[in-house]
Amino acid sequence: MSASSGTGHKRGHNPLIGLDIDRLEAEMGRYHNWLDEHADEAYIVAEQARKLGFDHKEFVEIPRAADLAGRTEKLLIEYLEGYEVADDIRKLLAEHDRETTSIMMAQSVARGFRERGYDLITAIDVGLRVGLAVLTEAVLVAPLEGISEVRLLNNVDGSQFVSVHFAGPIRAAGGTAQALAVLIADMIRRELNIGHYQPTD
């Protein structure tokens, strides 16, 4: 057997040769549209069934979303209370990476909640959850159950600092996201002009 017909020849083989790529992509697009349409129909049936009152809740708990921005908004719907974040997330993601977007959105939401008259703790809490949701692509439970409490405590000199309490589900986010959650909280407190923690002897 010659060298050209050995392993090296197989390694250079292109499996797409002879395939009609345009036709396959069109078929894939039609298939995705079919999935979307039938998923929508299934959700309509499920909503109607839930309204009969035989289940614990009268609505389907898992909302559908097309992208990270939509997932974030729907995941945190109970915390956002009508505050819309999806469009802002999309704009920021078009210009920045996910980590930068998570920090910028966290600050923006916290500031927006303060402007709407919410207290500091609520503003920090919701901002942190939005930032963590963007960071974890809104597919983990961490933004919901990984943050158990946000508190404002006092330093020895009387100034306030932010204290974030995490729960077990934060582990699903992974070590990097856990560390960045602390950074996000710190960036929020800077945005809202809250003091930093002052360690003592």
Please tell me what each predicted stretch does:
Residues 1-201:
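Extended, Lys/Arg-rich, non-catalytic nucleic-acid recognition/anchoring regions
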